A protein has these predicted regions:
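A detector for short, charged/polar N-terminal pre-domain segments
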Residues: 1-2
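Short basic helix-loop element that most often maps to the first helix and adjoining turn
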Residues: 7-20, 81-82, 86
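DNA-binding alpha-helical recognition surfaces that contact promoter or target DNA
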Residues: 9, 23, 34, 53
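Recognition helix of helix-turn-helix/homeodomain-like DNA-binding domains
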Residues: 26-43
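DNA major-groove recognition helix of helix-turn-helix/homeodomain DNA-binding modules
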Residues: 45-62
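Helix-turn-helix/homeodomain-like alpha-helical modules used for DNA recognition
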Residues: 60-88
Length: 88
């Protein structure tokens, strides 16, 4: 399950606004704001799922351990060489 903090962190890594994620996830902006709220508002599981799928499609990996939760942005799935690493 995607948390409010994970959603906000993932958007920050991607440089996406709430409007961008709502559009890519095909959910309303209001639904996304509810998901990202810390006030405990009810959110449909389908809303969480659609947001998670959109973020994962953009390269986000959701992390969850007994010590906490987080997000990771995978570097373009390895499809392009990174010029800054080519000489190393």
């Amino acid at each position: 399950m995607i948390t409010a903090r994970q959603s906000r962190a993932a958007r920050a890594l991607l440089g996406w606004t709430q409007e961008t994620l709502a559009d890519k996830a095909r959910i309303s902006l209001t639904a996304l704001k509810r998901l990202e709220s810390e006030s405990g508002l009810d959110v449909y599981e389908t809303t969480r799922d659609q947001a998670r799928r959109a973020l994962e499609a953009a390269g986000i990996v959701f992390l969850s351990t007994d010590k906490g939760q987080g997000v990771l942005l995978v570097d373009d799935h390895g499809s392009k060489p990174n010029p800054s690493n080519a000489a190393r």
